[in-house]
Amino acid sequence: VEFRGAVRPRTLDRKATPLRGNALAMDWNPERARVEAEANRTEHWGHWGPYLSDRQWGTVREDYSADGEAWTYFPFDHARSRAYRWGEDGMFGICDDHQLLCFAPAFWNGNDPIIKERFFGLSGPQGNHGEDVKESYYYLDNVPSHAYMKALYKYPHAAFPYDDLVAENARRSRLDPEYELIDTKIFDDDAYFDITIEYAKRAPTDTLVRITAVNRGTQAAVLHVIPQLWFRNTWSWSAGQPHGRIAPRSGVSNAFEATHPDLGTYTLYYEGEAEALAVENETNMRAVFDVENAQPYVKDGIDRAVRGERGATNPDLVGSKLGLHYTMTLASGASQTIALRLTNIPPAGEPLGAEFDPIFAERKFEADRFYAALNPYPASSEHHRVQRGAFAGMLWSKQFYYYVVRDWLRGDPLQPPPPESRNAGRNHEWLHLYNDDVIAMPDTWEYPWYAAWDLAFHTIVLALIDPGFAKRQLIMLTREWYMHPNGELPAYEWALGDVNPPVHAWAAYRIFQIEHKMYGTADYLFLERVFQKLLMNFTWWVNREDPHGTNVFMGGFLGLDNIGIFDRSATLPTGGHIEQADATSWMAVYSLDMMAIALELAQHDPAYEDIASKFFEHFLYIAYAMNEGDDTTGLWDETDGFYYDRLDLEDGRRFPMRVRSLVGLLPMIAVETLQPQLLERLPNFKRRLEWFVANRPELARNVASLSAEGLGERRLLALLDGERLGRMLKVMLDEAEFLSPYGIRSLSKCHQEHPLSVNIGGVEFRVDYEPAESRTGTFGGNSNWRGPVWFPLNFLLIEALQNFHFFYGDSYRVEFPTGSGKLMTLWDVATELSNRLIALFLPNANGERPFNGAVEKLQRDPQFRDRLLYYEYFHGDNGAGLGASHQTGWTGLVAKLIQQVSEYESAGKSPLDWEYEAMPASAVEPEIV
């Protein structure tokens, strides 16, 4: 096997050693070669990709209002007519990596009031559970270089039910389920088109496009297909900015040239009879603001022309936006394909000639080979389908994101000045922030903006297929034009200063381990770069979130929107503050992750040994404060065998907040094992460890097994010792509490019969078990951490169980489920939880995929039942998908779980069966998740 990878840093030059026993023998293939070429900067295959957002309207970036109501300032009804300032959107579109030139298809069924050029959905205020896309579409395939991509859109023959979707969701309360497109019955008689969009690259800047429509209905139907090419409007905001131009290519039929000073010239070739329609990508001022237009051919002119309006487009066929209008009549079951090609390379022959279809076939074959090499284990075809679908969704979710806070606050010279109040409003403390990158988004319609902790989980999945991109994402987030000068990482555009869990050190080390294991590359330069910046972030956490110096942390909502009885980002109605079990757990995890990275780097630079000792001490102090401390700090409840947040009132009274939630389970994830070989190689660190055991026993006894040695003479650093771990697992693995058929619930089911209620000044604050959507409007009401199953924290709990097993071995067994009498090792429990999560997407004994819920059409119809959606979260009892429907972001972690389960089950063993030499030579623990 030939291993290729990143250049080693000058001071950390240990050679990458292919690993015995657990290294994947990755077959070299063309797609792997393209990924390596991109990483090594020899070919820029990532220059073009699916970087066009699904939604730009309703975002903070486009909001110039005084009140910060982004949804109402730029609503869906403006999107077809109003130029965007900070980005573009479209359906299954592509663009260059700075989004100068964009391509996307649009459609019209002859019945809709507008052409379908972007996905429709409800804004936050319109939805009974917040914003929600109301379309039927699927990401089918993609590869890291985007040399092959495929997606599917289901478009009804009848008029799209825009008004019905808005009205019915407005009628429903938060106690009702969302009203989805499938609920309108518009697909019941199969009167719709299946439209497949495929892209294949012949070269990095030579993209072939194939759009195929199939009539699934019993009657003939007319479909209009309008491929569109346009330049992002960069010229309407300040003088002297480049203005792209699209015009017919001289002397060549069925071809248009798109020329831009910074991008050069691209040609769009197209086949067949299509009516060319050209306009400027500029606002229709008459339609939006009821004032005169500066020129006659504006952004929505193509929409109006397709629907029959004359004079809406430029007869000279020149502009900054082009539409090619095809009309096709399809009999029942019939299909038709349109071929296009966007390139800056002169074709050797006919641009849409004999090589066109073979290039698609070749790229599809290479994609199959790429994924077959990635997971060569004998998993079921369904496991492979689910894994590949997760990778596809993750890659389709890469989006160009542009946001310069200083310019956004000040406004643009050629536009009316924004309200003065904005200078003290949203994100005004982030004037340094300058984002101009391709970023892996949580969901490109519902969450078309990065979220700091989501992104960390995305990189774990991306590291399997494109470690170079995964590493660049983490490095990007820690660069000085993202990270605040005080060390804080930007959370998300709605509130850059909100606090997200500090999972980035964990992600960095996992990426390092995954790449080392799968590709034989140990990229110490990456690890060191991220570590140095995270030192600043760790310091920010210590200085800001532990204001009392007790090593018990606050932090705010920490990504778990409505999990507590109070809004943890707001001023408490009781006064005082909350000492948070999850914030403190996260800091314990952060300390251990930074220690692990420092120990890895200390193998090559002794200076890191002292830093590792510093983080070791941080962990000891946090463990003491959380587990024991004095009368004012401990969060462990000995009676309940659980961790709770604590409410500290201003008069000195303190009350545990007895909510059984993931907050109380999070201390379990603070776990790290130390190899004996590592301690021998780092004598200074070992001496410091042993000094604490001898001289600070009150600190050492709060760590699981600092002095006692476990399997293989390993040491265990954890907040939970074996006894407390067992007590917490008894609760976590109880089907009447946390254990769902599909993973670990975010809130114990015990609160279904025993809700927690507090009355303050006549106002009731209450926590109930809510296994489906949220019944409150907290944080927009579109997320719910009071019962559903979420992938990211399930993933961390699974990893924690594996790490505990790495120390305790097979002798430590627990009941699974609690009360069943069946004993399992911690490794087997982790595997069972993994399989329960994976089962959300697999056909059950009745042939039904749990994520599709009780919708008969989705479960039984052959055109729907095998199409996969990776929802934001899942019903705590029946597994139905909820929230954002295309959040392959962190739900894409199912791909990593499938990889792990496939590998270890095929070998019939856990990592404990491997020889230590098969592990990275200086690893704190093996890469086991």
Question: Model features per residue range: what roles?
Answer:
Residues F3-R8, T17, N22-S81, G93, ...:
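Acidic, mature catalytic/reactive cores of soluble proteins
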Residues G90-I94, F103-A106:
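Structured, charged N-terminal subsegments at the starts of enzyme catalytic cores
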